[in-house]
């Protein structure tokens, strides 16, 4: 399913945008509740090969982001800019003692390209060691802006639902988010929310779309 939020697409923008901002971020109603995990990245330390620890306030410290796209590097804005081969991102979150994983929501802010649902997957390992890959259930285009220098900003949200139904044991011991991108795209910011409740949280997949206050200017 592909969704467009109201007034999400802007034709041309001259005003600067906050670096590391996710415009109209999709926030699950269960964020910060018991048995949920949140991690976010507003800046990156490594463009290729090294780990990037989640740096957004309130993040679970066990999550790290790696990019293995050949030719990628940190650009002048501190984003991970893909070379011709594109990005090859792995976001890992450690191991768990057979917990049920009900839902996952991912927000991406990118420049000059976007990640399609066919380029993203969630890798799950169950209590029996079986590995399963699943694709996003829905994709929402939450914001798109074209700037006077020709650069294009996009904010997208990807949702995975009823995840434990894909696993033979119904429980997750390991998870990893993986996605690739077209060449030249820059990853500006990312968040991930995971719901580990045995009973689905109220409004398990309800999302609140929040605006963003400009706090830091893009370094262009």
Model region roles, listed by residue range:
Residues 75-100:
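Short beta-strands within extracellular/lumenal beta-sheet-rich domains
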Residues 1-16, 203-220:
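C-terminal cell-surface anchoring/sorting signal
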Residues 96-100, 110-118:
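Extended, low-complexity, turn-rich repeat/linker tracts enriched in Gly/Pro/Ser/Thr and Asp/Glu
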Residues 116-129:
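Short, surface-exposed beta-strand/strand-loop-strand elements in extracellular ectodomains
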Residues 176-185:
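Short beta-strand-plus-loop segments that form exposed binding edges in beta-rich domains
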Residues 20-83:
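N-terminal targeting leaders for non-cytosolic proteins
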Residues 131-166:
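Extracellular carbohydrate recognition and processing domains
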Residues 96-105, 170-172:
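Extended extracellular/luminal ectodomain segments enriched in beta-structured repeat modules
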């Amino acid at each position: 399913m592909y969704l467009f939020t109201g007034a999400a697409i802007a034709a041309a923008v001259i005003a600067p945008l906050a670096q590391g901002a996710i415009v109209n971020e999709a926030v699950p109603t269960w964020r910060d509740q018991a048995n949920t995990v949140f991690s976010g990245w507003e800046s990156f330390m490594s463009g290729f090969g090294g780990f990037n620890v989640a740096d957004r306030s309130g993040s679970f410290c066990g999550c790290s982001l790696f990019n293995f796209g050949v030719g990628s590097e940190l650009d002048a804005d501190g984003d991970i800019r893909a070379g011709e081969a594109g990005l090859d991102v792995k976001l890992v979150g450690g191991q768990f003692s057979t917990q049920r994983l009900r839902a996952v929501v991912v927000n991406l802010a990118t420049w000059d390209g976007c990640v399609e649902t066919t380029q993203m997957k969630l890798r799950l390992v169950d209590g029996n060691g079986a590995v399963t890959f699943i694709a996003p259930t829905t994709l929402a285009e939450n914001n798109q802006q074209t700037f006077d220098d020709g650069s294009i900003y996009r904010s997208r949200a990807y949702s995975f639902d009823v995840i434990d139904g894909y696993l033979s044991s119904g429980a997750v011991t390991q998870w990893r988010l993986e996605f690739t991108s077209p060449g030249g795209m820059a990853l500006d910011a990312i968040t991930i929310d995971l719901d580990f409740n045995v009973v689905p949280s109220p409004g398990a997949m309800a999302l609140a779309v929040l605006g963003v206050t400009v706090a830091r200017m893009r370094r262009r």
